[in-house]
Every structure is written in structure tokens, then in C-alpha cells.
């Protein structure tokens, strides 16, 4: 069993956090893990075998296999096992224990956990306890994820306003004009801003040639040239934008404080880093929609579908990234319908966009 982590570096809490472990009971009465079939002892520390992996910073591989013990942090999953009569045991990840969290925030994987000395039994009190415990666990993880994704006082999930100021989720008020959300930082610390809205469309009609070719996985995850690529695509196809819906949606996107042409179709590396941080972005979107009193004010990043990038792999294929496992980025036919979400990203030659983003973060 593997976990596909959203955090590149292990998280470490300064307090104990509660999780829930699904187990199975054999005919001989022994208790085992359901996937690796490892026998465990209730009331004892359960330590993982193997070495904790080191994930690459470019997120080209987010798969966590050996070196960790899996458990659930999703309330719905834990309660479902409990209601079906499955064995669920409360467990604790002790303070200072390294752990990773699943992209969709359903599972956690730590180097060790301490199992409770008895199974959970179904009751209203138990259900309430599970909900309270996991709400607390999720909030601890959320704060750790924001801390790990902070640069110069700005965090992934912070709001960018139309007046170019930046506001943390806790400081948001209804009268603020939010235009985007910080989605990741480049190697030099420059923040990328993802739009509040998205659409589903094809990348474009088939052509005889490609404009922005990157034809290897290794190069695609290091590709942060979305502004340049968008500019080149626009210069090539500006007289036939209707044939390239993904490009058209991004270059025509505008908000209060921005104009058409300020937003771009991100490159593969930019899109991959954005969807990796989907949980932090979506938490901020939930808060924004709640404060605005409009559930459709901003669109959440969707788990499952793929997001188009401006990076091409050939005349008939382009790159797209999903919100799941390590395999969720690759080449797809340009006629396929995927999700498109504009961003404010830096390009080496796009001086207009460069000055705009620098003004944002003075």
C-alpha cells in the first residue's frame, strides 16, 4: 500500500495527534494490518520497517511506500469502517514523529504510531469523539502545511487582493476584493498566483507543429516558463483563438485590478506544483466562499480531473497534471477535455508580467 504525499518534506508536530487505524482479525484471534498482513499488538507502539524515503523537490515522485505506518485522518472513512462493523483502533502519532499526508487528506503515514488497547465500538459518543479528534488533527496538519509552504511571511493559501496587497485566511473580510490565491513558490521564492475560477475545455485543435515542446518527464517537472509559453502561443494563434480554448480562456481572463493578458496558462511545472497544494488552496477557497456568502464565488481545485498546461509534447499532445499519484502528469491529446485554471506566473522574457508580479510582492 502506498501513500501519495502532498508534503515534500516530512511534517513534525509539537503535540500528539490522534489518527485511526483499520485492522483485521484472523481466525486465530490475532490482529493484522489489512494490506501488508503484519501482526500487531494492541496497546503497543507500532514501528514501520524500512527507511523513510526522501521525496524530490520538483515533485516528480510523491510515492511513499516503506518506512511508514498508514492510518486514516478522514472522518467519513473512519466512521464508515466503524458503522460497517470493521475493526478501527484509535492511535496516536506522538509529538516529534515524522509523517506525510495524502494529497486528498484521507490518510496519514508516520514512522510509528501507538495503538490504543481496544477496538472502537459503535455509539453516538464514539462517533462524536472520532469527529472531534480528527477535526483537531486536521487543524494541526493544516498549520504545519502552511508553515512548510511559507516564504518571507507569505504562505500558500494567502489571498491576493485587487489593490495588490496580501491577506492571510484568518484576516479575510467580506469587503475585500480577492483576485487570486498564492499556490506555490519558485526556487527563488517568487510566489505564483492561481485564479479563483476555472473551466473545462480542450487544449486546442490539431496543428502541424508545436510551439513549446518539452518531451521528457524529467524536463517537464522543472519547466516554469508558463508566461513565455503563453506569449508564444498567443503570438502564433491570436488570429484563431477560438481554435485554442485553453489559451483563450487564460489570456482573456481578467479581474478587478488586472486586465486581459495579465493571466497565463501555466507550464507543466507550475501546474504540477499548484495541484500539489490543492488542499491549502481549497481551504482558502472554502473560507472565501463562506465569507462572501456565495458557494460559487471561487472554484475549488477538483480531485480527479487533469489540468492543462501550456507545455506541449508534440503537435497533437500537451502536458496535463492531476491531483493524485506520481503518475498524474503526462501527455494527452489536445482534443481531450481537461480543466484550465489561469495563473500569474513569471516568464524570462515577459517583462510586462514580470513587473506586474513584482508590484504585487514589493
What is the predicted role of each segment?
Residues 21-28, 92-94, 195-197, 311, ...:
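Structured loops at beta-to-helix junctions and adjacent beta-edge loops in soluble globular domains
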Residues 268-362:
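C-terminal, surface-exposed recognition/capping segments
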Residues 134-259, 334-360:
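Short, compositionally biased
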Residues 72, 265-268:
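Short beta-strand scaffold positions
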Residues 258-266:
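Surface-exposed patches in mature extracellular/periplasmic domains of secreted proteins
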Residues 67, 87, 188-190, 261, ...:
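Residues that flank catalytic or metal-binding motifs in active/ligand-binding sites
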Residues 1-55, 60-69, 76-141, 360:
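Conserved NAD+-utilizing ADP-ribose enzyme module
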Amino acid at each position: 500500500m502506498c501513500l501519495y504525499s502532498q508534503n515534500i518534506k516530512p511534517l513534525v508536530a509539537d503535540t500528539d495527534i490522534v489518527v485511526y487505524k483499520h485492522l483485521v482479525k484472523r481466525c486465530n484471534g490475532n490482529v493484522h494490518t489489512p494490506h501488508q498482513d503484519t501482526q500487531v499488538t494492541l496497546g503497543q507502539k507500532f514501528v514501520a520497517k524500512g527507511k523513510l524515503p526522501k521525496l524530490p523537490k520538483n515533485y516528480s515522485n510523491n510515492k511513499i511506500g516503506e518506512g511508514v505506518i498508514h492510518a486514516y485522518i478522514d472522518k467519513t472513512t473512519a466512521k464508515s469502517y466503524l458503522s460497517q462493523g470493521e475493526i478501527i483502533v484509535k492511535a496516536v502519532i506522538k509529538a516529534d514523529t515524522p509523517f506525510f499526508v495524502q494529497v486528498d487528506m484521507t490518510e496519514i503515514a508516520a514512522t510509528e504510531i501507538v495503538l490504543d488497547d481496544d477496538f472502537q465500538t459503535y455509539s453516538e459518543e464514539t462517533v462524536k469523539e472520532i469527529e472531534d479528534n480528527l477535526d483537531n488533527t486536521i487543524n494541526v496538519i493544516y498549520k504545519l502545511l502552511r508553515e512548510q509552504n511559507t516564504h518571507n511571511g507569505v504562505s500558500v493559501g494567502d489571498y491576493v487582493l485587487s489593490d495588490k496587497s496580501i491577506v492571510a485566511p484568518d484576516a479575510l473580510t467580506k469587503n475585500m476584493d480577492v483576485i487570486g490565491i498564492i499556490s506555490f513558490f519558485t526556487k527563488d521564492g517568487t510566489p505564483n498566483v492561481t485564479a479563483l475560477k476555472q473551466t473545462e475545455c480542450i487544449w486546442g485543435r490539431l496543428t502541424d507543429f508545436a510551439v513549446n515542446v518539452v518531451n521528457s518527464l524529467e524536463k517537464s517537472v522543472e519547466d516554469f516558463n508558463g508566461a513565455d509559453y503563453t506569449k508564444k502561443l498567443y503570438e502564433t494563434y491570436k488570429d484563431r483563438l477560438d481554435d485554442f480554448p485553453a489559451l483563450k480562456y487564460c489570456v482573456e481572463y481578467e479581474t478587478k485590478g488586472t486586465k486581459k493578458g495579465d493571466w497565463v496558462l501555466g507550464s507543466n511545472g507550475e501546474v504540477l506544483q499548484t495541484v500539489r497544494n490543492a488542499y491549502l488552496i481549497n481551504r482558502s477557497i472554502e473560507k472565501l466562499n463562506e465569507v462572501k456568502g456565495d458557494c460559487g464565488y471561487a472554484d475549488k481545485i477538483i480531485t480527479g480531473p487533469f489540468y492543462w498546461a501550456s507545455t506541449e509534447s508534440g503537435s497533437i499532445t500537451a502536458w496535463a497534471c492531476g491531483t493524485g499519484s506520481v503518475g498524474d502528469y503526462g501527455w494527452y491529446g489536445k482534443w481531450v477535455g481537461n480543466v484550465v485554471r489561469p495563473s500569474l506566473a513569471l516568464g524570462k522574457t515577459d517583462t510586462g508580467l514580470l513587473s506586474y508580479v513584482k508590484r504585487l510582492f514589493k
